[in-house]
C-alpha cells in the first residue's frame, strides 16, 4: 500500500470513529503539514508508522510487550504541575497508547531525532537514548524538577516576558474563531462542551468556548478550548477527541480500549491531576507556566545577563535531553505489570547496534514517503 492509499484509508477510519465530528479543515491542514517536511510528516502519520514499522524492523516484533506511548517523538514532551504543585517534565500526549513491543518506542524516538536534525548522527542519537533507557530500567521514576535536574528545569521554565504571549495567542485564536459565521465554524458537539464544563473549577464564570487548531497528528479531530474567570483570573481547559490507537487498528491487539489515563497515571509517574478522559474526550489544563520545546522555534531562557535564545532543535537533540527522554520511556514501560524483568533481559541481550541501524532505515523510508506525498497536490 502506498502513502496516498494509506492516507485515504486512515481518513475513512476517522470518519467511522467520529462520524460527522471530523473537522475537514483540520484534515486539510494535516495534509499541508505532511508536505512541509519529513519531521512534521512523521508527527502527522502515526497510523502509517504502525503499518510499516515491523516491515522495516521485523526483529523487533519479538521484543517484550508493554503499554507503550506509540506516537512518541522529540516534541511529545512537556511540563505540568502534579497534585502537589511540583513542576514535572515528561511525555504529555498519550492518544495512541497501546500494548506493543517496547523497542518500538525507542525506534520511533530515534527516528524522529534523525528527521528533525539531519546533521546529527544516528549513532550519537541512539547511544544517548539507550543510555537513558538503561538508567530508567535501573532507577525508574518521574522527572520532578523542583529540586533535581537543574539543567532541565532551566530549559523548560518559561521566562517572565513570555507569559503574556500565551494569553495573546489565546486571544488571537478566539477572535479568529468568533469572526467566522456559524456556517463556517466547526460544530461544537455536546460531549466536548460537557467535558470542558465538567473540568472547570466549581464556581467559574460562564466560559467562552472556541475551536482550536493545534498539534499535527490529531488534526482532523475536534479540539476545543474553554476560558473562564475563576477566583480573580483566567483558567483554561482544552478538550480533544480520542479514538482507539492506530496500532490496534492495524495489529488487532488489545481491543478498542482507550488507555490514555492508564499510561498517564502509571506507577512511576507524577501525573497531571487535571488530565481526564470523559466520554471519549481528553481534557487537560492549559497554562502559561507549562512548556513544550519545539524543534523549529527559538527557545528563550533566563540567563544572568538577560534572556538568551537557542533553537529548540539544538536543545532537544542534545545528549542530556535525549538521555532524559530515554529514561522517561523506561519509567513508563516498567509500569506494565510483570514486564520489568523481561524488558531488562531483552534490552541487555539485544545489544546497541540495532537502534542506530533501525532508525536510519526508518528515517530513509519516512523521507521517501514524504517526498512522494509532497509531489502529489491532492489526496485522491
Outline where the language-model segments fall:
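Sequence-structural signature of the catalytic-core scaffold of metal-dependent phosphohydrolases
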Residues: 137-192
Amino acid at each position: 500500500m502506498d502513502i496516498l492509499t494509506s492516507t485515504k484509508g486512515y481518513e475513512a477510519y476517522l470518519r467511522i470513529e467520529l462520524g460527522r465530528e471530523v473537522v475537514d479543515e483540520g484534515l486539510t491542514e494535516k495534509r499541508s503539514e505532511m508536505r512541509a517536511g519529513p519531521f512534521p510528516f512523521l508527527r502527522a502519520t502515526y497510523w502509517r508508522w504502525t503499518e510499516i514499522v515491523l516491515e522495516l524492523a521485523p526483529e523487533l516484533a519479538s521484543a517484550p510487550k508493554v503499554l507503550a506511548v506509540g506516537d512518541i517523538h522529540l516534541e511529545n514532551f512537556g511540563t505540568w504541575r502534579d497534585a502537589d504543585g511540583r513542576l514535572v517534565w515528561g511525555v504529555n500526549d498519550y492518544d495512541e497508547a497501546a500494548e506493543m513491543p517496547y523497542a518500538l518506542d525507542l525506534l520511533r524516538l530515534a527516528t524522529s531525532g534523525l528527521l528533525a536534525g539531519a546533521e546529527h548522527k544516528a549513532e550519537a542519537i541512539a547511544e544517548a537514548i539507550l543510555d537513558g533507557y538503561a538508567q530508567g530500567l535501573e532507577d525508574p521514576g518521574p522527572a520532578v524538577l523542583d529540586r533535581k535536574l537543574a539543567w532541565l528545569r532551566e530549559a523548560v521554565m518559561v521566562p517572565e516576558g513570555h507569559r503574556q504571549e500565551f494569553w495573546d495567542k489565546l486571544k488571537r485564536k478566539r477572535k479568529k474563531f468568533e469572526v467566522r459565521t456559524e456556517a463556517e465554524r466547526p460544530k461544537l458537539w455536546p460531549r466536548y462542551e460537557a467535558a470542558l464544563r465538567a473540568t472547570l473549577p466549581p464556581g467559574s464564570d460562564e466560559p467562552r468556548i472556541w475551536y482550536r487548531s493545534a498539534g499535527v497528528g490529531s488534526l482532523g479531530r475536534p479540539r476545543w478550548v474553554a476560558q473562564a474567570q475563576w477566583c480573580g483570573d483566567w483558567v483554561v481547559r482544552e478538550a480533544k477527541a480520542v479514538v482507539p490507537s492506530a496500532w490496534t487498528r492495524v495489529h488487532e491487539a488489545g481491543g478498542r480500549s482507550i488507555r490514555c489515563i492508564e499510561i498517564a497515571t502509571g506507577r512511576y509517574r507524577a501525573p497531571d491531576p487535571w488530565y481526564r478522559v470523559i466520554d471519549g474526550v481528553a481534557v487537560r489544563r492549559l497554562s502559561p507556566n507549562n512548556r513544550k520545546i519545539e524543534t523549529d522555534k527559538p527557545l528563550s531562557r533566563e540567563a544572568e545577563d538577560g534572556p538568551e535564545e537557542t533553537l529548540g532543535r539544538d536543545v532537544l537533540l542534545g545528549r542530556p535531553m535525549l538521555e532524559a527522554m530515554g529514561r522517561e520511556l523506561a519509567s513508563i514501560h516498567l509500569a506494565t505489570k510483570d514486564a520489568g524483568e523481561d524488558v531488562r533481559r531483552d534490552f541487555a541481550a539485544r545489544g546497541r547496534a540495532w537502534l542506530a541501524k533501525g532508525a536510519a532505515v526508518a528515517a530513509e523510508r519516512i523521507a521517501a514517503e514524504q517526498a512522494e506525498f509532497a509531489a502529489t497536490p491532492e489526496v485522491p
